[in-house]
Each structure stands twice: as C-alpha cells, then as structure tokens.
Amino acid sequence: GNVYKRQDIDHGTYPYVTSSNPSAGGITVGNGFVPTKGLKVLGISKAYTSRVGDGPFPTELFDETGKTIRDLGHEYGAVTGRERRCGWIDLVQLRYSIMINGVTKLIMMKSDVLDSFDTIKACVAYELPDGTQTNNFPYDIEHVKPIYRELSGWKTDMTQFTSEEQFPHAFKD
C-alpha cells in the first residue's frame, strides 16, 4: 500500500516518518533475506487513503464523506480508538510506492467501504504551488493540491465476490 512509503525513513514524508524501513526492501535489511530473480512482490492498498498522526495528506477529506469512509472502514486506532484521517485514493503516491517496492501484483482491500457511493474520486496528479501539474511524486507534498478524476461507483456489495471475474465493470475501470 501507499501508507508505508509515506512513513519510510528513506522515502517517506520526512519528518513524519517511522525509524525503520516498512517496505519491500526493508525485508532484506531486517532478516538477511537475499532476493533472487523472479521474486514476486505483492503490494496491498486500500481503495481509499488513511493516515495516522501528523503529516501531509493531499487527499484528506474534512467533510461528511471523510467521516463516512472512516466509519464504514472502521478507521480508528486499535489501542487508543483515535480517529484516523481518511481521504480519496492517491494514485500518485500509490504509483510511487509500487515503483520503489518493485510491486509485481497489487491487491486492493476495503473496496467494500465505498460500495454505497454514487461516485468516487481518485487523485491522478498534483498541482504544485507554482501552478504546474505533475503526476510524479514530488519531494515536498506539503502544499500540493490533488487533481481528481471522478469515477462511477460500483453500487454493489463487493463482499459477495470470490474471484476477480465477478467484479463489476465500474470497479475494474
């Protein structure tokens, strides 16, 4: 997913990072595992974005939609019960995370949280402070503005499916 990249000591949104490498590369650092050719790296991402604690969050929603995502997704700290910050999926950060980690297959979880939405938004690029647009992950995301693509919701109970072939077209798109 894209959360661990934002918190990675080397690739995260410093100073809002952890002291470790919670990425595919961090596996080798922590246990001495030597990757070989043909290694499959599974990336896991939510269908929306959430964040614990401080730090830049371009797609954060401060309205009722953000609260709805938080409630439906049970986005509360397990120990403290603290509300997590929620927003639309940030494809700029997700693409960056996929690239840095060498992800070979992406698994999308919690898509059922968005089942009831007529439309959803996906951040496909950023507007930088100077007005230019980029779909590359910039060094500093503190003041970027998300550029969204609005998509039709799938309006289907995603928990009923057992294979990718069953997914509705609106979800696959």
Stretch-by-stretch model annotation:
Residues 3-4:
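Short, small-residue-biased leader/transition segments that mark boundaries at the very start
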Residues 13-17, 31, 82-87, 164-168:
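Hydrophobic alpha-helical scaffolding
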Residues 148-173:
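Extended hydrophobic packing segments that form well-structured cores
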Residues 7-8, 30:
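Short beta-strand-to-turn element immediately C-terminal to the catalytic PLP-Schiff-base lysine
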Residues 22-23, 92-93, 173:
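Short Gly/charged-rich anion-binding patches and loops
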Residues 9-23, 101-102:
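A short alpha/beta connector and helix-capping loop motif
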